[in-house]
UniProtKB/Swiss-Prot annotation:
It holds the Pfam family Reductase_C. It catalyses: 2 reduced [2Fe-2S]-[ferredoxin] + NAD(+) + H(+) = 2 oxidized [2Fe-2S]-[ferredoxin] + NADH. Induction: Transcription is up-regulated by aromatic compounds including biphenyl, ethylbenzene, benzene, toluene, xylene, cumene, cymene, and chlorinated benzenes. Is under the control of the BphST two-component regulatory system. The lineage of its organism: Bacteria, Bacillati, Actinomycetota, Actinomycetes, Mycobacteriales. Belongs to the bacterial ring-hydroxylating dioxygenase ferredoxin reductase family. This is Biphenyl 2,3-dioxygenase, ferredoxin reductase component. One of its GO terms (molecular function) is oxidoreductase activity, acting on NAD(P)H. It comes from Rhodococcus jostii (strain RHA1).
Length: 413
């Protein structure tokens, strides 16, 4: 069995790459392999609409007949056991070997579960797949006491949804503020207040020492020694890139598969994108970004590179969430050195938080301000030089600041 290009991974990175390959004119054989039985679906709906019961299943990224129309072969509910990067072969569980010209590793990430005692007790959940959320919906009932371990994006989204379902919810967060890494302390604190208004208990500076129970979880023991009664618990403390295949194949990995800014690995013809890839950042350094939008952007860049086109696609973290009735968007790393500028007040309406580093706009977070966020995104991507007083002045349109920054950049060139 031969194949020109094999995409390993049925998430947004894999299917976006397949679509981009066809859009850019690739007409050879194209195989998409996914370990789940479902066609690629929107994982961002799992912690919100699907868990809430508003949707029975997560929306498919594309309908079944789309794959036929685009001549993309799907191999579902199968696991890739090995990739021979020298011979360019891919081994499926149960066989066969697939002979390939190029391969894309888009294997994603799995939920991180710290190795504390009791993490395997019934009633302790993680959320990464449709099967995970279906089990939670069957198992969770109004009035149950749920402990959410981790106050990041997924943890806070799950907590909000669980509260709507009538559960009594507590969040345990090991740091001194919710969402601090992705939203910054100011917006993180504002989100904490909104969650508490919903009746969610938030406990900061407290991680988990162990889960206790006999046939099912009954208690969560915090790192500060306190006990929290728990009928159910969910662990939301990040994800681990699925690098096993890459490591077995001899590819360099460090918290993700190391790739260049077009997604290429050290092995010719082997590429990686999405949550599994440690991608170069526009601001320097590298890491796995673990966002839907970045996965799409990486996959698009990789598709071009796989077809021999010159691509340079360093990334900026770019994501969004909906929480307690508010839409929050973010670009860049809001936590870091420099100074902060708040434009507006989220208590009174739309607002943006900017981080300036060496006088340049390096990150932004918006609350209920999608139009201004679009302008803020351009400022961050350009690394625009804007004074803090001007940036925080709501009487000045961000569009005008953008225009001025663009003109300065053209003059500098």
């Amino acid at each position: 069995m031969t194949s020109d290009i094999v995409v390993i991974g049925g998430g947004v990175a894999g299917v976006t790459a397949a679509q981009s390959l066809r859009s850019e004119g690739y007409d050879g054989r194209l195989v998409l392999i996914g370990k789940e039985r479902e066609l690629p679906y929107d994982r961002t709906a799992l912690s919100k609409a699907v868990l809430a019961g508003d949707l029975a299943d997560p929306p498919l990224l594309f309908p079944a007949d789309w794959y036929d129309e685009w001549q993309i072969e799907t191999v579902l509910d199968r696991t890739v056991l090995q990739v021979d990067v020298t011979r360019r072969e891919v081994l499926l569980d149960g066989g066969p070997w697939l002979k390939v010209d190029r391969v894309l590793l888009a294997t994603g990430a799995s939920a991180r579960v710290p190795s504390f005692s009791g993490s395997d007790l019934p009633g302790v959940a993680t959320l990464r797949t449709a099967d995970d959320v279906h089990r939670m919906r069957r198992d969770w009932e109004p009035g149950q006491r749920l402990v959410v371990v981790g106050g990041g994006l997924i943890g806070c989204e799950v907590a909000t949804t669980a509260r709507k379902l009538g559960l009594e919810v507590s969040i345990l967060e090991a740091s001194d503020e919710l969402l601090q890494r992705v939203l910054g302390r100011r917006i993180g604190g504002w989100c904490r207040a909104r969650l508490m208004e919903l009746g969610i208990s938030v406990v900061l500076n407290t991680g988990v020492a162990e889960f206790k129970g006999v046939d099912r979880i009954t208690t969560v023991i915090g790192t500060d020694g306190r006990s929290f009664v728990a009928d159910r618990a969910i662990v939301c403390v990040g994800a681990e890139p699925e690098t096993a295949i890459a490591e077995q194949s001899g590819l360099a990995c460090n918290r993700g598969i190391l790739v260049n800014d077009s997604g290429g690995t050290a092995a010719e013809g082997v590429f990686a994108a999405g949550d599994v890839a440690s991608w170069p950042l526009l601001t320097g350094g590298r890491r796995s970004l673990e966002t839907y939008i970045n996965s799409q952007r990486e996959a698009t860049a990789v598709a071009s590179a796989m077809l021999g086109k010159a691509v340079h696609g360093p990334q900026l973290p770019l994501s969004w969430t909906e929480m307690a009735g508010h839409r929050i968007q973010m670009i860049g790393d809001i936590e870091g050195s420099g100074e902060y500028v708040m434009r507006g007040d989220p208590d009174d309406g739309p607002a943006l938080l900017f981080r300036l580093s060496d006088g340049r706009v390096t990150a932004a977070v918006s609350v209920d301000a999608p139009r201004d966020f679009a302008m803020a995104t351009r400022l961050v991507e350009r690394g625009a030089q804007v004074g803090r007083e001007v940036l925080g002045d709501t009487s000045m349109e961000l569009r005008e600041l953008n225009r001025a920054a663009r003109e300065r950049a053209l003059i500098a060139e």
